C-alpha cells in the first residue's frame, strides 16, 4: 500500500541484482502496480511453488502467493488484507530460510499498523523473524548510513528502565555481534566506538562499573573497541571525522537521533544475530508520496548490496 511495490520494481532492474539468484515473493498484481507507477518492466518467470524454480541463464523468479486471486489494495491506506499479504510473504521467506533454500532476505518497507491489523502480535519484525527462525542467541537491529554502522544495548524500552540494563554482559553482546557482522560485510578489523550513558561520560557510575570493563574485555579478544565516548560528540568523532566504523550505544535515541541527522534518507537496517543476512531500507512506507514515483531507491539498493555481500562472504566460510 506504500512505496514498496515501486521500489521493488526499480530494484529488480538494477544491474547488481544479476549477481544473485533472485526470488521475489508476493502477489503479482502488486508488482504490476509498482511497475505502472515506476514505468519499469522486468523479464521474470512466474511460479506458484518454490519447487518450480530452476535457476539458469540468469533468470529471476516471482513466487506468486496470490493463489489466483486478484486482490486490490488501496495506495496509501492501511488494511487487514495488505497486512496479511505482507505476513504471508515474509513467513514464506523465513520458511525457505529455515530449510536452507535461500541465503539472504532483502525486504521492502513494512507498515507496522497494517501488519498488526493482519495478525502480527510482535512488537516489530525482528522479533517475529527471531521467533520464526528459532533464534535463542542475542539478536539486535543494526542501522547503517554510508557504510557506518550502529548497534544498541537497549532498544524499545522506557528511558527510565535503561540504567537497569547497562551491565557489562549486555554491553559485550552487541559489540561482538556488530563486529562479526561488519567483518562479514567485508570490513576488516572494524573500529568500534562505544558510547557513554551519562553526560560527558562522567556523571554516573555506569561508565566505570560496566561500560569500561566491557570495552576492556572485548579488546582482550581482539576487537578494536574504543570509548566510552560522550553521546553529544560521538557522531562527530566517529562518523563525521571518520575515526571509527561503527558506534555501539546504550539506548535508542542516543544513536538514532545522531544517525538520522547525518543521513535519514540513506539509512539501511540490518537484522543482527539471525542465521542469515536480512536487510531492509530504514525508512517506512511513506504514504505521503506513495503512487507518485517519488520514492528514493538508494536505501533499498544499499540494503540489497549489504545482503548480497554478506551472503557471498558467508558462503565462503
Give the role of each language-model region.
Residues 1-317:
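Anion-binding alpha/beta catalytic cores of soluble intermediary-metabolism enzymes, centered on
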